[in-house]
Amino acid sequence: MNKTVRIGTRGSKLALWQAEHVAACLQTKGLEPQIVIIDTTGDKILDQSLSKIGSKGLFTEELEEQLHAGTIDIAVHSAKDLQTHLKGGMYILAITERELVNDVLVSHKPIDTLKNNPDLIIGTSSTRRRALLRKFYPQAKMVDMRGNLQTRIRKMEEGACDAMLLAYAGMHRMGYDSLIKEKLSLEEFIPAAGQGTLAIEAASTLDKEKAAVIRAVLNDAATETAVSAERAFLRTLEGGCSIPVFALAVERDTDYLLTGGIVSLDGTKYLRKEIRFTAADAEQRGVELATVLLKDGADEILAEIKKGLSKS
């Protein structure tokens, strides 16, 4: 077996940290990783909100093209950015162990919680976070905030906003824990499907022996089961990264609990339900939960969201 593993990644500091983390893990098993930096559409277009650009493969398409061409062996994605319908011949080889999944309130100012600071100007590029803010903290003012993590923090410190809502995992990986003011409640801010973990994508042409070694090193079975249910839920709702859908599966003593839902752009309509599942029926139960929500009115909320995004 050829021990070289070419790892495709975006070029941001966070993406490189993730790729280097994967590389370090692979080195422990005698593999020889090489990191290949690839620019994506989402990295190049920074003057528009994510919802205006579109939701299909913004941060992944170019990586998949290189997988298909055989110039890289695996691609490292933030699992929440990986579209639910993969291109032909592509598959998820591994899901890494999950970090803390919470969204966090980030600021350079002496503030503590969202509740105690109702008039903050909050920066975020996520339609899910914006919609949940409108539901639970309707008095908050929001501004769109694009760019890599360092750019967004710089913009905040220069006065573009008082605080930002971001994923804990990225802040922690980049060493910005001192800027985290509050870990937001999972009762209010349920994360995006796959948040806090990495998805390792490969092409079906990858050498089977090499694929098995990579999977054995990187895959966390419990996280894979949880993310499988979350992605099945998201896929059934047809929710891309510009649709405010949330999903989180948590391992319990003998099974898992999946909580999933959708919120309208203005925060006034909110559906959320739960379902239990096991490793054997994770995808099936994710589909079932989404189907129940669609029957309960999620289809109407989705139609309203898509109409609203097309006008914005």
From Swiss-Prot:
One of its GO terms (cellular component) is cytoplasm. The keyword Transferase applies. Its cofactor is dipyrromethane. It catalyses: 4 porphobilinogen + H2O = hydroxymethylbilane + 4 NH4(+). One of its GO terms (molecular function) is hydroxymethylbilane synthase activity. Pathway: Porphyrin-containing compound metabolism; protoporphyrin-IX biosynthesis; coproporphyrinogen-III from 5-aminolevulinate: step 2/4. GO terms for biological process: protoporphyrinogen IX biosynthetic process. Keywords: Porphyrin biosynthesis, Transferase. The modification S-(dipyrrolylmethanemethyl)cysteine is found at C241. The porphobilinogen subunits are added to the dipyrromethane group. Tetrapolymerization of the monopyrrole PBG into the hydroxymethylbilane pre-uroporphyrinogen in several discrete steps. Monomer. Belongs to the HMBS family. This is Porphobilinogen deaminase. It comes from Cytophaga hutchinsonii (strain ATCC 33406 / DSM 1761 / CIP 103989 / NBRC 15051 / NCIMB 9469 / D465). The gene is hemC.
